[in-house]
Amino acid sequence: MSRVAKNPVKLPSGVEVKLVGQLLSVKGAKGTLELNIHSSVEVVVEAGELRFVARNGDQQTRAMAGTTRALVNNMVQGVSQGFERKLQLVGVGYKAQAKGTVLNLALGFSHPVDYELPNGITAETPSQTDILIRGIDKQLVGQVAAEIRDFRRPEPYKGKGVRYADEVVRRKEAKKK
């Protein structure tokens, strides 16, 4: 069995889990998430925890059990606490402003960039150069943060661009004459 799948997923108070066929739905204070469980993985619902068992012992099935456990753990954490990513804008005139479901970005282009946020994702701008992306789906929060970063990645000479708050940009030295 996968070492990851051996550990059960503990359900905090206020989180409900429903298993109908191969569809697992997790409901919590922040919302509801659903996942189709792979047919080779069996989910055992016990008192206050979930266990994941591979139906047969081959390597691929054990790996799928571990992957499923990690995905469900992220779902449980998302509906109870939520996820967030912080982005920073570095550069002269780089600004961000959140208006409802649209994030307006000024990134040094000749035009402003308007990014439409998907359902379940919220963006805040505590300052003009900071963006806070929140949601219950870990994959979607990371995907939105990556798409915003891709508008203007940090460049290695001056470090200008959109970067994750914890990202360290490797700097290059300018060309010498």
UniProtKB/Swiss-Prot annotation:
Which Gene Ontology MF annotations are present? rRNA binding; structural constituent of ribosome
Choose any GO biological process term that the UniProt entry carries and state it: cytoplasmic translation
State the Pfam families in the record: Ribosomal_L6
Q: Which Gene3D superfamilies match?
A: Ribosomal protein L6, alpha-beta domain
User: Which key words are in the record?
Assistant: Ribonucleoprotein, Ribosomal protein, RNA-binding, rRNA-binding
State any GO CC term. cytosolic large ribosomal subunit
Assembly, in brief, is:
Part of the 50S ribosomal subunit.
Functional description taken from the UniProt entry: This protein binds to the 23S rRNA, and is important in its secondary structure. It is located near the subunit interface in the base of the L7/L12 stalk, and near the tRNA binding site of the peptidyltransferase center.
Protein family: Belongs to the universal ribosomal protein uL6 family.
Protein name stated in the entry: Large ribosomal subunit protein uL6
Instruction: Name the source organism.
Output: Pseudomonas syringae pv. syringae (strain B728a)
